[in-house]
C-alpha cells in the first residue's frame, strides 16, 4: 500500500507510484491467466469518495518473423479468430451474456488469440479476454472500402485528428489489460485516391509515443509500401 497526498486543485494532476513485486505470478495465456488487482481509493477527510479498480497482469512477450509468438519466454502457437461485436436482434448493443457466449464458444474451439475488429469493443470484452488468457489485437476504426474501388482515407484535418484522438483514447483506456498485445492501426486500406501512407506513419509514431511497450500491426489486402509501416 502507498499513500499520496494531493492538494485540492481545479486542474488535472498526474501522480506516479512505483513498487517492486518479487517473484511475480505471471499472466500466462489460457494456461494460467493469473491477474493481480490494483485499487486506487480517493479519500477526503478520512472518508472514501471514489475508487477505481484496474487489472494488473504481468507478462512479457516477443514476436519473431520466422518462429512466431513467445509468451513469457515460451513459444505459443496462436489459434485465433476475428470477432465483430454484433448479434442478431440486438446489433451492436450487446448484453454481457452475448460477450460471455462468444467467449465460451471461442474457448470450446481452442481459440487462444483474437482480433477485435474493426473498432474498440465493449470494456467487458477486454475483461473477459484478460480472465480467459486470450491474446488480443485491439484496433481503431480506420477501415478501407474492402473489395470496392472507392477510397478509405479522406485527407482532411478533421479526419486526421479524429483518428489520432481515437487511437489515444483506445490506448489510454485499455493500457492495463494484459491480454492486449497488439495495437491495430488500419484494415485493408487502398492507396488510390487520397494516399494514406504518411498518415499511417503518423499513427504509428503516435501509438509508440502513447505505449512504447506494445507493437503495432495492421491488416492489408494488397502489396506495396503500406505493408512495411507498422511493426507486424
Labelled PLM ranges:
Residues 131, 156-230:
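Active-site neighborhood of glycoside hydrolase catalytic domains
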Residues 1-118, 128, 132-136, 166, ...:
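Secreted/periplasmic carbohydrate-active enzymes, especially glycoside hydrolases
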Residues 88-90, 144, 189-192:
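Short, small-residue-enriched loops and turns at beta-alpha junctions
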Residues 80, 105, 129-130, 149-153, ...:
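Short amphipathic alpha-helical patches
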Residues 19, 34, 61, 69-70, ...:
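Phenylalanine-focused residue identity feature
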Residues 83, 119, 141-143, 186-188, ...:
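Active-site beta-loop-alpha junctions enriched in small/polar residues
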Residues 122-125:
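Active-site-adjacent beta->alpha loops and helix N-cap segments on the catalytic face
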Residues 79-84, 92, 137-175, 182-184:
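Aromatic- and acidic-residue-enriched carbohydrate-binding clefts of CAZyme catalytic domains
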Amino acid at each position: 500500500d502507498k499513500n499520496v497526498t494531493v492538494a485540492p486543485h481545479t486542474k488535472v494532476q498526474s501522480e506516479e507510484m512505483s513498487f517492486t513485486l518479487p517473484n511475480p505470478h505471471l499472466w500466462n495465456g489460457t494456461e494460467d491467466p493469473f491477474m493481480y488487482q490494483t485499487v486506487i481509493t480517493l479519500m477526503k477527510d478520512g472518508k472514501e469518495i471514489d475508487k477505481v479498480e484496474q487489472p494488473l497482469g504481468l507478462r512479457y512477450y516477443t514476436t519473431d518473423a520466422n518462429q512466431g509468438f513467445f509468451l513469457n519466454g515460451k513459444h505459443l502457437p496462436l489459434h485465433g479468430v476475428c470477432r465483430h461485436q454484433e448479434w442478431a436482434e440486438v446489433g451492436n448493443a450487446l448484453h454481457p451474456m452475448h460477450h460471455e457466449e462468444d467467449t465460451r464458444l471461442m474457448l470450446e474451439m481452442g481459440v487462444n488469440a483474437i482480433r477485435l475488429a474493426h473498432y474498440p469493443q465493449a470494456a467487458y470484452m477486454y475483461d473477459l479476454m484478460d480472465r480467459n488468457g486470450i491474446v488480443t489485437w485491439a484496433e481503431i476504426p480506420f477501415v478501407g472500402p474492402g473489395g470496392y474501388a472507392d477510397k478509405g482515407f479522406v485527407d482532411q484535418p478533421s479526419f486526421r485528428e479524429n483518428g489520432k484522438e481515437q487511437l489515444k483514447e483506445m490506448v489510454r483506456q485499455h493500457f492495463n489489460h494484459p491480454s492486449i498485445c497488439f495495437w491495430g492501426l488500419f484494415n485493408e486500406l487502398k492507396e488510390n485516391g487520397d494516399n494514406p501512407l504518411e498518415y499511417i506513419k503518423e499513427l504509428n509514431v503516435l501509438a509508440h509515443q502513447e505505449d512504447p511497450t506494445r507493437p503495432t500491426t495492421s491488416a492489408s489486402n494488397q502489396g506495396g509500401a503500406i505493408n512495411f509501416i507498422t511493426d507486424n
